[in-house]
């Protein structure tokens, strides 16, 4: 892990297209601004962990659960082109 010390207004550049700016420091909180291309996902760690856990849950559905969903949904017709 690289550890840097920055003051308000100072920046950190990552690669060619990500810039992190220290905007404000108040007590234990540091407000930062992040400039990055739209395709770069930027998430707070707690949201990232929550999404990861939800994905694990979704991927661990049992065969019995899937059978139950299909049984309860067998009247469903997928919309298609009108003929």
From Swiss-Prot:
- Per UniProt, what is one Pfam family of this protein? CsrA
Q: Can you provide one Gene Ontology molecular function annotated for this UniProt record?
A: mRNA 5'-UTR binding
- Annotated localization: Cytoplasm
Alphabetized, the UniProt keywords read: Bacterial flagellum biogenesis, Cytoplasm, Repressor, RNA-binding, Translation regulation
One BP term from GO: mRNA catabolic process
Q: Name one GO cellular component term.
A: cytosol
Keyword set includes Glycosyltransferase: no
The answer to whether the entry has keyword NAD is no
**HAMAP family cross-referenced by the UniProt entry:** CsrA
* Function recorded in the entry: A translational regulator that binds mRNA to regulate translation initiation and/or mRNA stability. Usually binds in the 5'-UTR at or near the Shine-Dalgarno sequence preventing ribosome-binding, thus repressing translation. Its main target seems to be the major flagellin gene, while its function is anatagonized by FliW.
Quaternary state and partners of this protein?
Answer: Homodimer; the beta-strands of each monomer intercalate to form a hydrophobic core, while the alpha-helices form wings that extend away from the core.
Family recorded in the similarity comment: Belongs to the CsrA/RsmA family.
Name by which UniProt lists this protein: Translational regulator CsrA
Q: What is the lineage of its organism?
A: Bacteria, Thermotogati, Thermotogota, Thermotogae, Thermotogales
Task: From the UniProt record, report the name of the gene that encodes this protein.
Answer: csrA
